[in-house]
């Protein structure tokens, strides 16, 4: 028997678990280019004592810990506190999903270098998503979280000083009042947590908005100097675009319209996002665009 991990994929899996502590067996699929034999490969790593299976979760075993320390892999000691287990498993799931992404990297809260240990346990953020070099402090609100927890997320964002771009992944958008999530930051993206939206997140900063503007406004709109819109003709057009629901941008547009009763806003978005934004901005003029046509996507295929 070969007692070392077989190839880069198995090494990558071990490195991930060393950093994230836990990994659901179902999420191991994100680490292998072919799905045909990956469960056998997991079983082999368990037999070799690199990994240990606890119910449906994988953690490092004795040899796995030794291996990671030998090669100086980033290693996080296992947190056995059951109170934090659902949070840690969600963080691991998110990290595994973006593991192979060329545009998006996820750093868990406990691996953030700029946060003290007290901050990690006291604060509610789960980590940072880096999308094309832009960092987003990230939160998660699950179906199980109470209204008290939602309030604690709001307070947590209010006291954040470093990060001005925020992502809130939420199981059910109806759980929150969108107006409660405007803090004066650059962006607060409130996103329903689904596989479709996670895939879209990879291309958050990859949309060719200027091409969309050119198509619909024929070179008669320019990048705006205002904070309440993205483009304008400096006459009567105030144009904002939405890839996801941005509560900060909505709040700025609302304020502009409230102070300028004779003006309106043009909003460029998908039909799906329009249904949410229209609840907040019912009088805006909507231009519906299939944003897929304006994104160059990375190609990662799982068999």
Residue ranges and their predicted role:
Residues 138, 174-303:
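Long, compositionally biased intrinsically disordered regions
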Residues 32-47, 52-53:
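Short amphipathic alpha-helical interaction segments
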Residues 21-32:
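Short acidic, hydrophobic short linear motifs in intrinsically disordered regions
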Residues 16-20:
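Short helix-capping/hinge SLiMs at alpha-helix to coil transitions
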Residues 64-97:
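Short, amphipathic alpha-helical interaction segments positioned at domain boundaries
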Residues 43, 52-73:
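Accessory beta->alpha helical hairpin/"wing" motif in late/C-terminal subdomains of nucleic-acid enzymes
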Residues 1-13, 81-84:
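Short alpha-helical segments that sit at the start of domains
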């Amino acid at each position: 028997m070969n007692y070392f991990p077989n190839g880069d994929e198995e090494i990558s899996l071990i490195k991930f678990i060393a950093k994230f502590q836990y990994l659901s067996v179902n999420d191991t699929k994100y680490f292998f280019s072919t799905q045909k034999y990956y469960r056998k490969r997991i079983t082999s790593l368990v037999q070799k004592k690199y990994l240990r299976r606890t119910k449906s979760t994988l953690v490092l075993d004795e040899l796995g810990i030794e291996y990671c320390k030998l090669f100086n892999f980033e290693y996080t000691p296992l947190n056995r506190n059951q109170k934090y287990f659902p949070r840690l498993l969600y963080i691991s799931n998110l990290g595994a999903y973006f593991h192979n992404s060329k545009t998006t990297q996820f750093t868990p809260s406990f691996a953030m270098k700029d946060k003290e240990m007290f901050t990690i346990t006291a604060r509610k953020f789960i980590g940072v998503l880096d999308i094309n070099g832009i960092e987003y402090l990230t939160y998660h609100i699950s179906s199980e979280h109470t209204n008290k927890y939602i309030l604690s997320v709001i307070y947590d964002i209010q006291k954040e000083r470093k990060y001005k771009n925020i992502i809130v992944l939420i199981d059910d958008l109806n759980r929150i009042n969108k107006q409660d999530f405007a803090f004066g930051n650059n962006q607060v993206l409130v996103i329903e947590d689904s596989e479709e939206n996670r895939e879209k997140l990879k291309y958050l900063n990859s949309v060719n908005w200027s091409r969309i503007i050119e198509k619909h406004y024929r070179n008669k709109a320019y990048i705006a100097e205002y904070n309440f819109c993205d483009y304008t003709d400096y006459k009567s057009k105030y144009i904002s675009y939405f890839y996801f629901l941005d509560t900060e941008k909505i709040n700025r547009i609302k304020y502009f319209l409230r102070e300028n009763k004779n003006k309106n806003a043009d909003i460029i978005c998908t039909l799906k996002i329009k249904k949410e934004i229209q609840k907040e901005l019912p009088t805006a003029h909507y231009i519906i665009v299939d944003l897929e046509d304006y994104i160059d996507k990375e190609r990662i295929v799982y068999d």
